[in-house]
Amino acid sequence: MRIIELTEEARTNILENLLKRSPNSYGEFEGRVNEIIENVRANRDAAIFDYTKRFDGADINAENILVTEDEIKEAYEKVDEKLLTVIRKALVNIRKYHEKQRQYSWFDSEESGIILGQKVTALEKVGVYVPGGKAVYPSSVLMNIVPAKVAGVKTIVMTTPPGKDGKVNPATLVAAKEAGVDAIYKVGGAQAIAALAFGTESVPKVDKIVGPGNIYVALAKKAVFGFVSIDSIAGPSEIMVLADETANPRFVAADLLSQAEHDEMASAILVTTSRDLAEQVSKEVEGFVAQLSRKEIIQKSLDNYGYILVAESMDEAIATVNEIASEHLELVTKNPFETMTKIRNAGAIFVGEYSSEPLGDYFAGPNHVLPTNGTAKFFSPLSVDDFIKKSSIISYSREALEPIYKDIVQFAECEQLTAHANSIRVRFEADSYPHLTLPTKA
C-alpha cells in the first residue's frame, strides 16, 4: 500500500478520489436505469420477466416468480447445520440490539385541557433488496429484515436475482425465512426496484425499499425516491483504521483487507501517527494479499483507493478521520474510548484491537447497513427508526384555546392568511360571524 505524508493537499486529493465512487457520479448509467423503470411501470410483469431472462438468464414467469415453501425446505436441506446455527446466533444478537431502538407513542396532558403527543406507527409494507452477483450475503438479509420486524412492519417482501436455473441461493433463503420475511420474489436489478416502487401483477407495491445493490440498483432507488421511501443510496464499502504506535500491524493489515475484498471500488485507509507502524502494515498487507482468494479484486481496490496516511499528531489524524467520514472506523490507540469521544463522523465505530470490522458485519448486533461516501456526516446506520413514521397529536379544549386564540389570529394576520385567522376567530367572535351560531360552553 502507498504511504503518504498527511498534508492538506494530500487530504483534499484523497477526498476527491474517494467521492468519485459515489452513485451521484454515475450519470452515464442514469438513462438506462430510467428506461428500465419506465418499462416496468408501463408493462409490469412482462417487463421484469424479459429483463430477468436477458440479464440473469433465468426463465421466470407468473407461476414461478414467488419462492415456494418447497423451495425454502430444499434450501434448508442444502445449508450446512453449522451455518444455520451461526445464522440463528447472529439473529439473536441483531434482534436484541434493535429491540433497544424501539420507539413508543407518548401523550402529555395538562389540566387546562391541552393534550399533546406523538403517535408512532410502523410502515405497512417494506421491500428488501438482496443482491446476487459476485458474492452471497445472508448477513445483509438479517440486517435489513430484523429492524423492520422489530418495528412492527406488517408485510416484508424480498427481491433477489435468481441463478440461471431459476433458483435462489440457499443461504439467502434460509436467512430470510429465519428473519421472518413474508414473501420472496425472484427478480433483481433496477427492474426489481421499479417493481417494488410501482407494483406489478406479481410483485406488490411497497412503502419503502431497503437493501444494497450495484450501480443500477443504487440509481434506481434514487430515481424512485418520492414515489416510495428508501434507506439510502449506498456507495462502495469503506474501512478506515485510526492507529498509534501501540497497534498490532498484522491486525490492522488484516482488517483493511476485510473491506478491500468486497469489490474493486472499495476503499481501505490507515491513518496513523507512527511511521514505523505504517511501514509494517504495508509489508503485512503485501504478505496477506498473496494468500487470499479474492486477491485480484483486493489488489485493484488497494491500487485505486488504498492509502496509509502518516499524520504529525493525533489531532491532525482525528481531523482527517472526521473529514473523510468513513463507513467503518476502527480505533486502535492506547486509549481508544478516549479517542472515540473526539470522533464526530463515522457509520460504525469499532473500539479496541479485538473489535474487528467483520464482527459488526456478521455477529455483534448493530446494523451493518451504514452511510458511505462521506454521508456519515449527516446519515445514520439502518435502524428501527427507518421503519416507523411519527404523527403529531394536538388536542385543545375550548377552555384551553380561548385565552390564547387572539395570539394565533395575530400570527395568521401577520402572514396575511385570513382564512387561518378566521378558522380560529369563528369559534369565539359571534359579532364577526352573525350568520353562525357559536357553540356554547359545556
Predicted feature descriptions by range:
Residues 143-154, 177-179, 197-203, 221-223, ...:
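Alpha-helix C-terminal capping segments
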Residues 108-174:
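Conserved small-residue-rich beta-alpha loop and adjacent elements
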Residues 181-258, 262-267:
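Conserved NAD(P)+-binding/catalytic subdomain of aldehyde/semialdehyde dehydrogenases
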Residues 210-212, 232-243, 259-282, 298-309, ...:
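Short loop-to-beta-strand entry elements in the cores of soluble alpha/beta enzymes
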Residues 1-124:
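N-terminal Rossmann-like NAD(P)+-binding subdomain of aldehyde/semialdehyde dehydrogenases
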Residues 433-440:
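Conserved small/polar residues in nucleotide/adenosyl-binding loops
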Residues 322-430:
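C-terminal core of ALDH-fold dehydrogenases
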